[in-house]
Amino acid sequence: MSVTTKDVAYIAELARLKFTDAEQERMTDELNMILHYVDKLNEVDTEGVEPLNTIHDQINVLRADVEHTPLSNEEALKNAPDRQDRFFKVPKVIG
């Protein structure tokens, strides 16, 4: 399997990307190199190798829940550059 410049142009169109002709050629070459590498991986003998689902044997390892005293409102706000009553005051971000 190989990728053509027509394939790259089609994928770029779907992704709403614009490439120059040089970029399109480079993308075509790079994608073909990747596919060639994947084809090489298909040649590897994996007979007797168990499929790997994760890279380690630990599943859902979570930290222990430790109860602690939360910050008071004053402690939380003491380094705030701006505040209003007991709330952080931030600049408007939606016009």
Curated annotation (Swiss-Prot):
Q: Give yes or no: UniProt keyword ATP-binding.
A: yes
Query: Which domain of life, per UniProt?
Result: Bacteria
List its EC numbers: 6.3.5.-
User: Which InterPro entries does this entry report, sorted A to Z?
Assistant: Asp/Glu-ADT_sf_sub_c, GatC
- What does it catalyze? L-glutamyl-tRNA(Gln) + L-glutamine + ATP + H2O = L-glutaminyl-tRNA(Gln) + L-glutamate + ADP + phosphate + H(+); L-aspartyl-tRNA(Asn) + L-glutamine + ATP + H2O = L-asparaginyl-tRNA(Asn) + L-glutamate + ADP + phosphate + 2 H(+)
Name the GO terms of the biological process aspect: glutaminyl-tRNAGln biosynthesis via transamidation; regulation of translational fidelity; translation
Q: What class of enzyme is it?
A: ligase
Q: Pfam families this protein is in? A: GatC
Gene3D superfamilies membership = Glu-tRNAGln amidotransferase C subunit, N-terminal domain
Key words, A-Z: ATP-binding, Ligase, Nucleotide-binding, Protein biosynthesis
What's an example of a GO molecular-function annotation for this chain?
A: glutaminyl-tRNA synthase (glutamine-hydrolyzing) activity
Q: Which family does it belong to?
A: Belongs to the GatC family.
What role does this protein play?
Allows the formation of correctly charged Asn-tRNA(Asn) or Gln-tRNA(Gln) through the transamidation of misacylated Asp-tRNA(Asn) or Glu-tRNA(Gln) in organisms which lack either or both of asparaginyl-tRNA or glutaminyl-tRNA synthetases. The reaction takes place in the presence of glutamine and ATP through an activated phospho-Asp-tRNA(Asn) or phospho-Glu-tRNA(Gln).
The record's PANTHER family line, in alphabetical order, gives: GLUTAMYL-TRNA(GLN) AMIDOTRANSFERASE SUBUNIT C, MITOCHONDRIAL
**Assembly state and interactors?**
Heterotrimer of A, B and C subunits.
Q: What is this protein called?
A: Aspartyl/glutamyl-tRNA(Asn/Gln) amidotransferase subunit C
